[in-house]
Amino acid sequence: NSGGGIVALHAALVRQTDWKWLSELGGCDFNSDSEFLEARVMVDPNAKDHPAVRGFGKSFLYKADWTNHDKSVTGIPGIQVLLRIDESTYEPVRDFFKTRGGKAMGKDHPIAWINTLNNGRFFYTELGHDVRSLDTKFGRTHIIEAIHWAARLNKE
């Protein structure tokens, strides 16, 4: 609320329903996830100039374990989706969660977004379960530029 910044990775939104402030910032809660798999990631056309995704084209293949949330953040006031994932290119719910009510998100599956709630800056990405999803050119750029954006170290 006072203009600070938060960069949240992967599990930051797991079971935060008791922490209303973080739930409001993130816009959703965890439902399930996939195995570590390659999938098609798409840059939201309205976000192509955001520093955390700029220069990576309209879509690309990427490996991670992909998180499913209890709802999409699309359309929530203050939230801008940066990346979405094409669930037709991978199996979105691993077996462990299939037997425990885990659900895929469908055609609207955001995987990275920002929220400019009040005066602060919040960045969330599904990357970061472990180093495998971060130790690539995209992973490093995505996180470093997110930190710069949240800390207001760049022009955006």
Would you name each region that the model predicts?
Residues 28, 35-118:
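Catalytic beta-strand/loop cores that center a nucleophilic Ser/Cys/Thr
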Residues 18, 48, 52, 139-143:
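Stable alpha-helical elements in mature extracytoplasmic
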Residues 2, 15, 22-31, 58-61:
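Alpha-helix capping at helix-to-loop junctions
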Residues 6, 12-16, 47, 59, ...:
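Solvent-exposed loop/turn segments at secondary-structure junctions
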Residues 22-27, 62, 70-79, 128, ...:
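Oxidoreductase and adenylate-handling cofactor-binding alpha/beta cores
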Residues 7-12, 25, 34-36:
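Active-site histidine-anchored catalytic micro-motif
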